[in-house]
C-alpha cells in the first residue's frame, strides 16, 4: 500500500478534481500541502457538484478527513465562506472531517490589497495573479513576520507580532501613497474570525505521522500545476509556492519516505491561464475548437484558457522534477474527430535543438515547437470505461505519449463523470 501524491503536470486546470475525488474514495485522509484559495477545482459526487478552492476534496466524502497543511497560506475568511457554502449544499464541516495546521500562515486583507496594487500598477507584462494575497502572504512567511493560525489562540501575543508585520507593510503603503493601517484594525480583523477557524487547528505533522504508522491511506492533493512552480516553472509567470511533488513532504510535515506513488495529471492537449510562455499555443480555429469543446474557463477566475497541442517536452520535465510514477491523462474526448493531432517533441531555439524548455525567460520566448503529427480518429472516446471502448488510433496516441514523456498512463479520463475512467494501475496498490 502506498500513500499517493497528485500533482498537475502542466500549468494547472488538468482535471485534478475528478481524479482526486476518484482516488479519495480509497483514502482515509486527503491533504492540501501548498497554495491557497487561488486555484479551484470542481467535484461531482453523485448528483451534487462542489466547487472548492481551499478545502481538501476529502471533506465532501463520508469517513474521510481533510487536512490543510503548513505549506498552505490560509485566508481565514475564505475558509469560513467555503465552509458556509458547503453547509448550504448539505455538507457539514467539523473537526471530525477537517484539520488545519496550527503553523499555517494567514492571509490578511492587507495582503489582498498589496497583491492587487502590484498587479494593476506593474509596468509591462502582468504576472497574472488572482489578487487574493497569496504571494504577499508567502513573502511575510519567508520574511518571518507572518501571523499564523496558532497566534489567534494567544491574543495576548498578537500586538507585538502585528507591530512587526505593519512595520514592513506600512512602509510599503507609504511608498504607494496609501494610508497606513493601524494595529487595532488588524487585531480586530483577526479577533472577529478567530472563533470560526480555531476549532480546526491541530499539530498536523504529528496527526499524519500517527495515521501513517497506523496504516491509514493518505492522499496528498496538489493545487495548480508543476509548471507554475516558483523554482521549476516558467518564472516569473509562476505561483508563489513550490508545486512539485516534493512539496508534499515539506508542506505537510511528513518525511519524504512517507510519499509512495506520485501521480501526475495531464490533459491530452495543453492549456494555460494568464500570461507567460506557451510554445504550442494555437491562435487559430483549432485552438478555438479545443477551448470550446473542453469548456476551458477557470474555476476560480472564469478567465478563458489559452489552448494548444500536447507538449511532451514540458510534461517530461515534470515527470523528472516531480518523480512522477504514472500519469492520469484527461480530456482525451476533446480530441475526438480531429483528422490529425500534433505533439511537441522538441524546441528549436536560434537553430539549436532542445529536448527541454530552458529556464531563461528570453530563450523561452524564442522557443519554436518541433512537432510530430499523429493521425486522429473518427470514433468517440467520450464515456469509454475500458480499452475495448477506445478507437485503435486513440490507443496509439496514448501509447505514443507514454513513450515521449517517459512515464506510463495509469488512468485515462474520458469525460467529467467520475466513473468514465479507465484504470490501468491503481496508485494505492503500488
UniProtKB/Swiss-Prot annotation:
Protein name stated in the entry: Adenylosuccinate synthetase
Biological pathway: Purine metabolism; AMP biosynthesis via de novo pathway; AMP from IMP: step 1/2
Annotated residues for binding of substrate: 299-305
EC number: 6.3.4.4
Keyword Chloroplast: no
SMART domains in UniProt: Adenylsucc_synt
Molecular-function GO term, any one: magnesium ion binding
Organism: Methylorubrum populi (strain ATCC BAA-705 / NCIMB 13946 / BJ001)
Function: Plays an important role in the de novo pathway of purine nucleotide biosynthesis. Catalyzes the first committed step in the biosynthesis of AMP from IMP.
CDD domains tied to this protein: AdSS (cd03108)
Entry GO CC: cytoplasm
Cofactor binding notes: Binds 1 Mg(2+) ion per subunit.
Reaction equations catalysed: IMP + L-aspartate + GTP = N(6)-(1,2-dicarboxyethyl)-AMP + GDP + phosphate + 2 H(+)
The family this protein is said to belong to: Belongs to the adenylosuccinate synthetase family.
Cofactor: Mg(2+)
Amino acid at each position: 500500500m502506498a500513500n499517493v501524491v497528485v500533482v498537475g503536470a502542466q500549468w494547472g486546470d488538468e482535471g485534478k478534481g475528478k481524479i482526486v475525488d476518484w482516488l479519495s474514495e480509497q483514502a482515509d485522509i486527503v491533504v492540501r500541502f501548498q497554495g491557497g484559495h487561488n486555484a479551484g477545482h470542481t467535484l461531482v459526487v453523485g448528483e451534487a457538484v462542489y466547487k472548492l478552492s481551499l478545502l481538501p476534496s476529502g471533506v465532501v466524502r463520508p469517513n474521510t478527513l481533510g487536512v490543510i497543511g503548513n505549506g498552505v497560506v490560509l485566508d481565514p475568511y475564505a475558509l469560513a465562506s467555503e465552509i458556509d457554502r458547503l453547509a448550504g449544499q448539505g455538507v457539514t464541516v467539523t473537526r471530525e472531517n477537517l484539520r488545519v495546521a496550527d503553523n499555517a500562515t494567514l492571509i490578511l486583507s492587507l495582503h489582498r490589497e498589496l497583491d492587487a496594487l502590484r498587479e494593476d500598477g506593474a509596468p509591462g507584462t502582468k504576472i497574472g495573479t488572482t489578487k487574493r494575497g497569496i504571494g504577499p502572504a508567502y513573502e511575510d512567511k519567508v520574511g518571518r513576520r507572518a501571523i499564523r493560525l496558532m497566534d489567534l489562540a494567544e491574543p495576548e501575543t498578537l500586538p507585538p507580532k502585528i507591530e512587526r508585520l505593519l512595520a514592513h507593510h506600512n512602509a510599503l503603503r507609504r511608498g504607494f501613497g496609501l494610508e497606513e493601517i493601524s494595529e487595532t484594525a488588524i487585531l480586530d480583523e483577526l479577533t472577529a474570525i478567530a472563533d470560526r477557524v480555531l476549532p480546526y487547528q491541530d499539530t498536523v505533522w504529528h496527526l499524519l505521522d500517527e495515521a501513517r504508522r497506523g496504516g491509514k491511506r493518505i492522499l496528498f492533493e496538489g493545487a495548480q500545476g508543476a509548471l507554475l512552480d516558483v523554482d521549476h516553472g516558467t518564472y516569473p509567470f509562476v505561483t508563489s509556492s513550490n508545486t512539485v511533488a516534493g512539496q508534499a513532504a515539506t508542506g505537510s510535515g511528513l518525511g519524504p519516505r512517507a510519499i509512495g506513488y506520485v501521480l501526475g495529471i495531464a490533459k491530452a492537449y495543453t492549456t494555460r491561464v494568464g500570461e507567460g510562455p506557451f510554445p504550442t499555443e494555437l491562435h487559430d480555429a483549432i485552438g478555438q475548437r479545443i477551448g470550446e469543446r473542453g469548456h476551458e474557463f477557470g474555476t476560480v477566475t472564469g478567465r478563458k484558457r489559452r489552448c494548444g497541442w500536447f507538449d511532451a517536452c514540458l510534461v517530461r520535465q515534470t515527470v523528472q522534477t516531480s518523480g512522477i510514477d504514472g500519469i492520469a491523462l484527461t480530456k482525451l474526448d476533446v480530441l475526438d474527430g480531429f483528422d490529425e493531432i500534433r505533439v511537441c517533441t522538441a524546441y528549436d531555439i536560434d537553430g539549436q535543438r532542445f529536448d527541454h524548455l530552458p529556464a531563461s525567460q528570453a530563450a523561452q520566448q524564442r522557443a519554436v515547437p518541433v512537432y510530430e503529427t499523429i493521425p486522429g480518429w473518427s470514433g468517440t472516446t467520450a464515456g469509454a470505461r475500458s480499452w475495448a471502448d477506445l478507437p485503435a488510433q486513440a490507443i496509439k496516441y496514448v501509447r505514443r505519449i507514454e513513450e515521449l514523456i517517459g512515464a506510463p498512463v495509469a488512468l485515462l479520463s474520458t469525460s467529467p463523470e467520475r466513473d468514465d475512467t479507465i484504470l490501468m494501475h491503481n496508485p494505492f496498490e503500488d
